[in-house]
A protein has these predicted regions:
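Extreme N-terminal flexible tails
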Residues: 1-35, 40
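An anion-binding catalytic pocket shared by soluble metabolic enzymes
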Residues: 41-129, 138-139
């Protein structure tokens, strides 16, 4: 199965979200795949910060993935070794179904994240995001 040609790099340079800011709860109308991706990656980065805020991060353990809206056999994941509270859009890694880093060279892919989430995203095309965390509550 072949994907359409990937236009790389995908712009993630403006991905620095403030630690705390009020956002809109209203749905956002995104017209292009790039706008949809940007919106979803902003929410993913915010999700990492929320997990951190509520204590769902034990050291560097855990991962959250998001299926790419334009290339459904690819997903975004946090790099290994980066604390959830520090993650920005530009830190995220785009990985294909074979574990190849498509975008985010120089960053370390968490092999456990890939092993778990690649199977989940392959088996459940209706699932766009998944999370796995270690917290003080799980001890």
């Amino acid at each position: 199965m072949s994907d359409k040609e990937i236009k790389l790099p995908i712009d993630t340079s403006l991905g620095k979200l403030p630690q705390k800011e009020k956002g809109s709860l209203l749905p956002i109308e995104c017209k292009s795949p790039e706008e949809i991706r940007r919106h979803q990656l902003e929410r993913l980065a915010a999700g990492f910060r929320m997990f951190s805020h509520f204590g769902y991060d034990e050291g560097i353990a855990g991962h959250i993935t998001l299926r790419d809206p334009e290339y459904p056999h690819y997903f975004w994941v946090n790099p290994f070794g980066m604390h959830f509270g520090q993650i920005c859009i530009s830190d995220l890694i785009l990985v294909d179904r074979d574990g190849n880093i498509v975008q985010g060279e120089g960053k370390m892919l968490n092999t456990a994240a890939f092993a778990i989430h690649s199977r989940l995203h392959e088996a459940r095309p209706d699932v766009n995001a998944a999370a796995h965390s270690h917290s003080m509550y799980g001890k």
